[in-house]
Amino acid sequence: HRDLHSFPTRRSSDLAGSAIAMQIIRVQNRSVGLPAIQEPEYRSITVEAGMSARQVSQLLEQARLIDDARAFERFLEVSGDARRLQQGTYLFKRGMSYASIAEEMVNIPQAVSKRSLVVYAGYTLRDIDSLLGNSGLAGDGEFLQAVQTVAFERGLPFTEGWFLSGTYEISQQKHVALSLAIAMQDALNEAVRPYLAELERLDITLAQAIIIASMIQRETNEVSQMPIISGVIHNRIKADMPLGIDATLRYGLGVWDRPLTETELQSDHPFNTRRTQGLPPSGIGAASMAALDAALMPQDHQWYYYIHDKQGNLHPAKTYGEHKENIARYL
């Protein structure tokens, strides 16, 4: 039937921070079964107000950016930079010289302008990277690099989906991409904190909830439809039914502007939820708070199928026969 999956319009489905927060994420992700994020070339540190040269040197050593904290501290003392280090979040490439690291933390603009940046729900990490580039706030690939750094440092099992959509205040200085990535990840951590009991009730991990939220977001922008779609996804998972959400395959193939071919729909691609059982390997975009809420608070019903009609209205069904009738009636 008619393909309605082109982003950002509504879609149909053919079948379907803090240390405490970091600890929660690591515990919840143990059973995900995905390969760990590889250690990135860049690492970040945050220098708090009042930190001494020794404390900063120890941070750098802990981040494996330098081998010897005492040697770097002595370098700062000899160069006269020990008392000139500025607070802030910094992104360093492994293997940088002592002089280059010190210069980053000493020579920063004092007057920094700020602007609001809207990261729309459903945006992929590549979309956000392009948004920063087109806004002149960061270079090509900087945000993708930053999320890899954040994911590694926080023990995330994958990157896509762990960064909450919304409006963010951006300081127009160095490391804008890293600052945004940290802010988006912190926002998601705070958003999920009240729902930890729901994870146990639903018998899913936080990582799985985030994948579900990203799928819901791609399926609809209508908040009232989200709990219904979430209920369908959870029902199908419990019944060991393929999810059949074509947006996952579109994400995996990077195809949003044309109908999927029959060959693609029948492929064994890991993001093809028509063919593979269970959830895709990662999220497929940035969820909104509403989608996250729906993923963790699905509507309790007996539907296993749904479609959107040409006006975007949702038509769920309990059986495949009812689903076929809805297709004939509404599409």
What kind of region is each of these model predictions?
Residues 10-23:
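Single-pass alpha-helical transmembrane signal-anchor segments
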Residues 1-12:
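Short, small-residue-biased leader/transition segments that mark boundaries at the very start
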Residues 21, 52, 126-138, 152-331:
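Bacterial extracytoplasmic/cell-wall-associated proteins, especially those involved in peptidoglycan
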Residues 20-194:
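Signal peptide-directed extracytoplasmic domains
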